[in-house]
């Protein structure tokens, strides 16, 4: 998956670090990042290209990969456009970076977007509208007027691979009103007051009207596009396989043969990685949770 950058080491410890000319600066416009792609390899501008230094005050340290520092900067559009003109740089959608390499640079550009999206929406206090200032000791925006503190937020969500044991088919869906039209697995965000296992039962019932059992935890993945932490689960159909599709969320859903699941060598997302496991019939390698007592809650959503 895209976050697997070993042997490189990602470190997100907060520090008041000043940029050096050889450090990397990540510059975003909407959901796109400024990048150069040469022979399939990604690179980002250096801080020196925009004269970012300790006196500029225009950047914030994000993280390091190995010993190399990455900064986020808000630079005047005219200055960026002048830099881009006649260069190999352009703005790429962060969601498309996975098609290139090296993996650590793909990860940097995608994770940088999570930081960018958070900082971009934390300019003013949500309580009193005073401009926020960055805390000096941790990654937190503080209101100098009312003291309100804003920490980075991750939104927990689930990806669910559902198998019908009686037919050995897998449930897939397509999102409604989205550009992405390939097969996906059932997915959704956790709501306040529920466990992540309860999220699985609720989302499956809401989106396709099914009950499931034997939840088996697979793995997690940070997902920058939605600032989410994804939890992957495999499970089995419990009862009737007839689908009641929520067309506000899904364009359609269907049971398909395992061999029909999309598969390629990238597997950059948790969804694609789980589809690979399902194609290879390896979901049984992951033991069901010792206690999954959400049957009654599941039924309450029918």
How should these model regions be labeled?
Residues 60-66, 141-143, 160-162, 223:
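Short acidic-hydrophobic surface loop/beta-edge motif
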Residues 111-163:
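Cys/His-rich short segments
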Residues 141-184, 189, 211-212, 235-237:
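N-terminal strand-loop-strand
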Residues 184-219, 233:
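The catalytic Nudix box helix
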